[in-house]
UniProtKB/Swiss-Prot annotation:
Organism of this sequence: Lysinibacillus sphaericus (strain C3-41)
Role noted for this protein: Bidirectionally degrades single-stranded DNA into large acid-insoluble oligonucleotides, which are then degraded further into small acid-soluble oligonucleotides.
Gene: xseA
One of the record's GO molecular function terms: nucleic acid binding
Protein name per UniProt: Exodeoxyribonuclease 7 large subunit
Main localization of the protein described in the UniProt heading: cytoplasm
InterPro entries (alphabetical): Exonuc_VII_L, Exonuc_VII_lsu_C, OB-fold_nuc-bd_dom
Pfam families xrefs: Exonuc_VII_L, tRNA_anti_2
Length: 452
């Protein structure tokens, strides 16, 4: 038989390994069995045998997966395992590489956990692209946990110690039992409606997987994902991992750690401020020293050591301009003086004094004429006035009283006819020097041709 028909052990082992790698049914398997020959290496890896009544298989759990265990694997423990089967080429044996392991008794919960995790992961709820950043200096922090557990005490104590400027708003929340998941969802939605907090801490203290199961519910995961406020999950201990941890914006191993992640340390901030202050002072001192050296160098430079040379050309130019200005002012003054003299001569030739004297004399003559005319007019008017007075006096009916006539009045009305009176009437007779009251005794009619 030709030697070409024989495979080497290495080639055969590699071929078998490729078969294992290509089989999709061996990439992720769920197996239950009993732990045997458990060895926890100082490197953190765990080596053991998984067996049942009919078979056994070697298994390895590397440190990265082993650190997530919530329990310590022990001899004879019944467990549920998720992992993949592959060939260890060095010994030509196949073995189970364990990714997750849970103790028996919670098998249904473990399966439900993995199914929901796979579903939400496919939907993209775990992607980093959706994670919101935690604010560096939150003013208000919402805490969703039980008010009777140790978690609330640890969170509040840590927040007040590290960053007392932040206000803590507590949303009392059920964290265990059938009503826990709906209550967690309700308080997350309430905190979003209030819109007063910049970050939320959602969690509780440690416990069994049944105790923590509310944080593995789908409604809680979706409420965390839909929250507009960044959420820090703080469920159980460091080895406990829930669906809420995968969906939240930041996962904290413990409630105390969540508080530390939510706020800065005031002492660190203070030290940072002092350090930056010192750096600024040092920078200012260095800058001042550099500027002082630059100033000294400039002061010792040639132009500044003899500054008169800098402005000497300007001084000479200024002297020239000053001399030219004085000359120009003298020439201009002479021109203005000549113009003034010429103007004075012109004014003298056309002096208004003669015209004023002529008009003065004419004005005086006119005044005399007006005076004479006014005197004549007044005298003439006086004569006319006196003639009018005499005429009025002659026509005045009262003036006849001085010649012996009287005027008779009855009831203050002047009597013009004898028909206006009756016998026994009383009449008032007005004389030029007084009045007389008389009684009518008889009325005598006037005969024709008879004079008074």
């Amino acid at each position: 038989m030709s030697s070409a028909s024989y495979l080497t052990v290495k080639a055969l082992t590699k071929y078998i390994k490729r078969k294992f790698d290509a089989d999709p049914h061996l990439r992720e398997v769920y197996v239950k069995g009993e732990l045997s020959n458990v060895k926890i290496h100082q490197s953190g890896h765990i080596y053991f045998t998984l067996k049942d009544d009919g078979a056994r298989i070697a298994a390895t759990m590397f440190k990265a997966a082993a650190t997530k265990l919530a329990f310590e694997p022990k001899e004879g423990m019944q467990v549920f395992i998720r992992g993949d089967v592959n060939v260890y080429e060095g010994y030509g044996t196949y073995q189970l590489y364990v990714q997750e392991m849970q103790p028996d008794g919670i098998g249904s919960l473990f399966v439900a956990f993995n199914q929901l995790k796979e579903q939400l992961q496919k939907e993209g709820l775990f992607k980093l692209d959706w994670k919101q950043s935690i604010p560096k200096f939150p003013e208000k922090i919402g805490v969703l946990t039980s008010t009777t557990g140790a978690a609330i005490r640890d969170i509040c104590t840590t927040l007040k110690r590290r960053y007392p400027l932040a206000e803590i708003l507590i949303y009392p929340t059920l964290v265990q039992g059938a009503q826990a998941a709906p209550n967690i969802v309700q308080n997350i939605q309430r905190a979003n409606q209030d819109a007063t907090c910049q970050v939320l801490i959602v969690g509780r203290g440690g416990g069994s997987i049944e105790d923590l199961w509310a944080f593995n519910e789908e409604i809680v995961a979706r409420a965390i994902f839909e929250s507009r406020i960044p959420i820090i999950s703080a469920v159980g201990h460091e080895t406990d991992t829930t669906i809420a941890d995968y969906v939240s914006d930041l996962r904290a191993p413990t409630p105390t750690a969540a508080a530390e992640m939510a706020v800065p340390d005031q002492m660190e901030l203070f030290q940072r401020v002092l350090s930056q202050k010192s750096q600024i002072h040092q920078m200012v001192r260095s800058q001042l020293m550099a500027e002082r050296q630059r100033l000294n160098k400039l002061q010792q430079s040639y132009p500044l050591s003899m500054p008169e040379r800098l402005y000497r050309p300007f001084t000479e130019r200024l002297a020239q301009l000053e001399s030219g200005l004085q000359t120009a002012m003298q020439v201009d003054l002479m021109k203005k003086s000549a113009q003034l003299q010429q103007l004075h001569s012109t004014v003298a030739q056309h002096s208004p004094k003669k015209a004023l004297a002529f008009h003065q004399r004419e004005l005086e003559a006119r005044m005399q004429q007006l005076t004479r005319a006014a005197t004549y007019y007044v005298a003439k008017q006086q004569q006319q006035f006196e003639a009018t007075i005499r005429t009025l006096e002659a026509l005045n009916p009262l003036s006849i009283l001085t010649r012996g006539f009287t005027v008779a009045y009855k009831d203050q009305h002047m009597i013009k006819s004898s028909t206006e009176v009756q016998e026994q009437d009383y009449l008032t007779l007005a004389f030029h020097d007084g009045k007389v009251v008389a009684e009518v005794k008889d009325i005598l009619p006037k005969n024709e041709g008879e004079s008074l």
